[in-house]
Amino acid sequence: VTGPSDPALRRSRVCYDHLAGELAVRFFSTAMSHGWFDAQHLPDESTSVRLLPIGREGLARLGIDADLTADPVANTRRPGCRACMDWSERRHHLAGTIGARLLTHCLQRGWAVRAPDSRAVVFRKRGERALFEAFAE
């Protein structure tokens, strides 16, 4: 493990416009193991992944709209889903339009808050529970 020595940044932080850190890596790993995404290959750097129907349903249980067809930003060259290498965990977390929606949703629902003057994202206990409840279905 490399990266920040600050435990809060290791735990959860913003990477551009999406979640990174231990919690984000665990979420993406759990989603992959539950068949939410199909990764053709995951090289050392970022790569596109495909959101599968079961993943669309899981995101809906979380309250996240996974429809990319009506979103003008999503219809740009930006991928809908992308695996982004987490530099502190050396494993992938979720990026792209869906990754950004996940971060926005967590903040809007009050599951997490941005730490002042930091990239750290602090999850409340109920927020972390809610984030993983969709996998219990």
Where are these regions (language model features)?
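Long, charged, low-complexity, helical-prone intrinsically disordered regions
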Residues: 1-137
